[in-house]
């Protein structure tokens, strides 16, 4: 009998941030560019997150994965679904996070921005944090509009929520005797 269990693995913040710097002003050809159909910011955020975890969740609808433009989870490209997947309470494969205050963010975390009264619509990745952490010294990278090392206070937003990545769950197969 094969037993599958989840093991917690660390989040490689450095790998996520390096990926962000590499691809902030261009597009990785392995992924579709969603600029023309709603924006590429959360697709880029997911790519960065995947670079730091290496684990996807292939659960239809509720998972977090990308195979091609027609086979991906809503959480890979959708701002609210990205957040909902990360802060889920039941362990399942893939990265996980918790919402924190702005003062608690670290490089490799994500900040979602709301520009109107309705909904959050942008997901930049934090690439550097000054001390003490504040909007003028938290630097982010993003697609749609492409930016890197951009101070958070350059965004004229009404609200923000911060997602602190804690690690990822990885499924391991063990032979049971």
Can you describe what each PLM-predicted range is?
Residues 40-47, 109-112, 122, 140-148:
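Residue-level signal for functionally critical sites in structured catalytic/ligand-binding pockets
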Residues 2-77:
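N-terminal capping segments
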Residues 126-177:
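Glycine-rich, aromatic-bearing surface loops/beta-hairpins
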Residues 58-61, 123, 152:
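Short, solvent-exposed loop/turn and secondary-structure capping segments
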Residues 25, 49-50, 116, 129, ...:
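Residue-level marker of positions within ordered structural domains that often coincide
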Residues 12, 18, 22, 47, ...:
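Mature, Sec-exported extracytoplasmic domains of Gram-positive
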Residues 66-140:
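...with weaker cross-activation on analogous glycine-rich loops/strands in unrelated enzymes
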């Amino acid at each position: 009998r094969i037993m599958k269990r989840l093991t917690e693995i660390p989040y490689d913040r450095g790998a996520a941030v390096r990926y962000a710097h590499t691809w902030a002003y261009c597009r990785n050809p392995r992924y579709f560019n969603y600029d023309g159909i709603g924006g590429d910011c959360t697709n880029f955020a997911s790519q960065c997150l995947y670079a730091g975890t290496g684990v996807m969740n292939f659960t239809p609808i509720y998972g977090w994965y990308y195979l091609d433009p027609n086979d991906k989870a809503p959480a890979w490209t959708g701002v609210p679904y990205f957040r909902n997947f990360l802060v889920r309470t039941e362990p399942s494969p893939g990265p996980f996070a918790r919402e924190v205050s702005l003062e608690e963010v670290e490089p490799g975390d994500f900040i979602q921005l709301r520009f109107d009264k309705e909904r959050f619509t942008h997901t930049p990745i934090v690439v550097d944090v000054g001390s003490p952490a504040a909007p003028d010294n938290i630097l982010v990278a993003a697609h749609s509009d492409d930016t890197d090392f951009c101070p958070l206070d350059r965004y004229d937003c009404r609200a923000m929520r911060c997602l602190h990545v804690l690690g990822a769950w990885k499924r391991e197969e063990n032979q049971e005797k």
